Amino acid sequence: MNELIKHKLELLPDSPGCYLHKDKEGTIIYVGKAKNLKKRVRSYFRGSHDTKTELLVSEIVDFEYIVTESDTEALLLEINLIQKNMPKYNIKLKDDKSYPFLKITNESFPRLVITRYIKKNDGLYFGPYPDSYTANEVKKLLDRIFPFKKCKNPINKVCFYYHLGQCCAHTICHTDKAYWDRLIDDVKHFLNGKDDKIIEDLRSKMLAASEEMAFERAAEYRDLISGIATMRTKQRVMSKDLQDRDIFGYYVDKGWMCVQVFFVRQGKLIQRDVNLFPYYNDAEEDFLTYMGQFYQDKQHFIPKEVFIPEAIDEELVAAIVPTKIIKPKRGEKKQLVALATKNARVSLQQKFDLLEKDIKKTSGAIENLGQLLKIDKPVRIEAFDNSNIQGTSPVAAMVVFVDGKPSKKDYRKFKIKTVVGPDDYASMREVLFRRYSRVKKEGLQAPNLIIVDGGVGQVNVAKDVIEKQLGLTIPVAGLQKNDKHQTHDLLFGNPLEVVPLPRRSEEFFLLHRIQDEVHRFAVTFHRQVRRKNSFSSTLDHISGLGPKRKQLLLRHFKTITAIASATSEEIQALGIPKTVVEAIQQQITDNKNDRSSP
C-alpha cells in the first residue's frame, strides 16, 4: 500500500457511494458500491484475501470515490460506471447474449419476421427463443398456417409464396383492419399456447381433404398438426398461470458466483441463461450489479414479473428493473427460485470439477515431461522464438508457462540490437544472454526448463550461452517443426537426441501449445515493430511533426494507408495544424509515386 492510498483511506466517509480502483496507468480496473465507503474500501487493504482478490489489490495504486444519498443511488451509479468504463475486474456479461424474437410488424400489410432487436411501439414481439434455429422453426410453422405478407411486390403482383398459400397479395388479401386484427389475435393465441381451436380447424380440413381424395393436401394438414404437437413437447410447463416471468437464482463458492435465469413465457420454460464470474464484493451486492447490467442491455425483454432469491433487497431490484419484483415465500413460486438456485450450484460445481480435472491433466503432463527428460519437474518453462523478414525489424519473444498455464505477466519482448541481417543463431545468442545475465545478476526466478524454437543449431547456441558464458545449470531443449510448420520433434540431451514423445500424449499437447504461443507472440510483436518503423520512416523529416504527433497519428490511424485515406479535416481533428497535414499528405503522395516509378 503506497502513501497516497494510506492518506486517502483516512479521509473516507461513513456514507453510501461508489469507489473506483485504478492501476499505475490511471485506468479504472474495478468499480464497486458500498453502504459504508470507509468500511468497504479499507477492507481491501487489511487482512488476508483469496488469490484473485490479492491480484486485484496488487494492481491498485490509487482510488476515487463518489458519495451518494442512498444505497439505491449508489447501485444505479455503479451500473452506469461499469457500463462506461468496462473495468477488467468487474462482471462481464457474455457477448451477443441477445435472443431472437418473432415480430409482427406495424405495416399496412403486417409481416412476420425474426429479430434480435426490440424497438418500442414498432410491432408485436413474441419470445425470446433460445436460438435462431428454434425461432426459424416456429416461424416456418406459422408461415404455413397464417398467410402474412412475405414479399415486397408492388400492387397487382403475386409472389411464389402466394401460390403456396403462405402470402397474401396486396389486392387479393383483405385490406380491412378487422381481418388483420383477427389474424394477429390468432397468432397471439397460438404462441400463447391456446392452439386447440387451430388444431381443430386443421383436423377438420385434413378430414375434408381426405374425403375429397386430395391426399397430398391432407398430408400437409397432418404435418402441420404434428409440428404443433412437437413444439408443445419441447416446452416444459413451469407454472399454470401462463405468466411471463424471469426467475433468478445464484450460488457462490470459492470466490466465484454463478447466476441462473429461467426465461418463462406463457408458463413455459423456453430458455435459461448461465453466467459464472469471480466476485470481489459482497455476494448480494454483486448479484444486484449483475441484474442491473442484465436489464440495462436493451435486448433483454422485461417480463411482467421477476422472481428473486430471499437474500436480495426487493426495493433495490425495483429501482433498476421496471417491472413487478417478487420474492416468493412459499409454494410453487418459491420452488422455482430454489430450482434456479440449485442449477446455479450444479453449474458452479461442474466448473470446479472441470478445473480440477484440467489441473490434474496438466500436472501429469509436466511430471511426465520431467521424467522423459530426466530432470526435475519443469514447473516453470520459458520458451523463445525469433521473428524477422529477411533480417528487417528483427525481434524475439519469450513466453512463460507456470504449472502448464501461460503466465502472461511474465512474457517479454526483445528488439535485436547487435545483429545485422538475417542471423537467427546470433539473434538467439543475444536474447538469451540478455535474459539470463539479468536473471543471474538480479536474482530473478530461473526456469526449470528453457525451450528454443528450432533445431540442433539453435539448441547448441542456447546451451553455449547458458552453460559456458553464464555458468548456469538450466536444462535446454529444442522444438523442431516439420515441413508443414507443425510441432514435430523434441531435442534434448548431451549429445542432442530426439526424445520419443507419443503424439497423443498430454505432454506433447503441452509442448505444442507452448510452441504455438511463443510463435504467435513473436510474430505479433514483429508486425507491430514493422508497422511502427514503416510509419515512422514515411513521416520522418516533416517540419512540425515531432515524436508526440507521430505517436498520436499512429494510435489513431494505425497505418499509413489509413492516413492516406483520411480527409484533411479528420487529421486536423487530432490537433495537427493544417500546414502540417498538407505536408503529411504530400509526403505520402511522393512516396507512392517513387514506388510506382520504373
From Swiss-Prot:
<dbReference type="Pfam" id="PF08459">
    <property type="entry name" value="UvrC_RNaseH_dom"/>
</dbReference>
<dbReference type="InterPro" id="IPR001943">
    <property type="entry name" value="UVR_dom"/>
</dbReference>
<dbReference type="Pfam" id="PF22920">
    <property type="entry name" value="UvrC_RNaseH"/>
</dbReference>
<feature type="domain" description="UVR">
    <location>
        <begin position="196"/>
        <end position="231"/>
    </location>
</feature>
<dbReference type="InterPro" id="IPR047296">
    <property type="entry name" value="GIY-YIG_UvrC_Cho"/>
</dbReference>
<dbReference type="InterPro" id="IPR035901">
    <property type="entry name" value="GIY-YIG_endonuc_sf"/>
</dbReference>
<dbReference type="GO" id="GO:0005737">
    <property type="term" value="C:cytoplasm"/>
</dbReference>
<keyword id="KW-0228">DNA excision</keyword>
<comment type="similarity">
    <text>Belongs to the UvrC family.</text>
</comment>
<keyword id="KW-0963">Cytoplasm</keyword>
<protein>
    <recommendedName>
        <fullName>UvrABC system protein C</fullName>
    </recommendedName>
</protein>
<dbReference type="Pfam" id="PF01541">
    <property type="entry name" value="GIY-YIG"/>
</dbReference>
<keyword id="KW-0227">DNA damage</keyword>
<comment type="function">
    <text>The UvrABC repair system catalyzes the recognition and processing of DNA lesions. UvrC both incises the 5' and 3' sides of the lesion. The N-terminal half is responsible for the 3' incision and the C-terminal half is responsible for the 5' incision.</text>
</comment>
<dbReference type="GO" id="GO:0009381">
    <property type="term" value="F:excinuclease ABC activity"/>
</dbReference>
<dbReference type="Pfam" id="PF14520">
    <property type="entry name" value="HHH_5"/>
</dbReference>
<dbReference type="InterPro" id="IPR004791">
    <property type="entry name" value="UvrC"/>
</dbReference>
<dbReference type="InterPro" id="IPR036876">
    <property type="entry name" value="UVR_dom_sf"/>
</dbReference>
<dbReference type="Pfam" id="PF02151">
    <property type="entry name" value="UVR"/>
</dbReference>
<dbReference type="GO" id="GO:0003677">
    <property type="term" value="F:DNA binding"/>
</dbReference>
<dbReference type="InterPro" id="IPR001162">
    <property type="entry name" value="UvrC_RNase_H_dom"/>
</dbReference>
<dbReference type="GO" id="GO:0009380">
    <property type="term" value="C:excinuclease repair complex"/>
</dbReference>
<dbReference type="GO" id="GO:0009432">
    <property type="term" value="P:SOS response"/>
</dbReference>
<feature type="domain" description="GIY-YIG">
    <location>
        <begin position="14"/>
        <end position="91"/>
    </location>
</feature>
<keyword id="KW-0234">DNA repair</keyword>
<dbReference type="GO" id="GO:0006289">
    <property type="term" value="P:nucleotide-excision repair"/>
</dbReference>
<dbReference type="InterPro" id="IPR010994">
    <property type="entry name" value="RuvA_2-like"/>
</dbReference>
<dbReference type="InterPro" id="IPR050066">
    <property type="entry name" value="UvrABC_protein_C"/>
</dbReference>
<dbReference type="InterPro" id="IPR000305">
    <property type="entry name" value="GIY-YIG_endonuc"/>
</dbReference>
<keyword id="KW-0267">Excision nuclease</keyword>
<keyword id="KW-0742">SOS response</keyword>
<comment type="subunit">
    <text>Interacts with UvrB in an incision complex.</text>
</comment>
<dbReference type="InterPro" id="IPR038476">
    <property type="entry name" value="UvrC_RNase_H_dom_sf"/>
</dbReference>
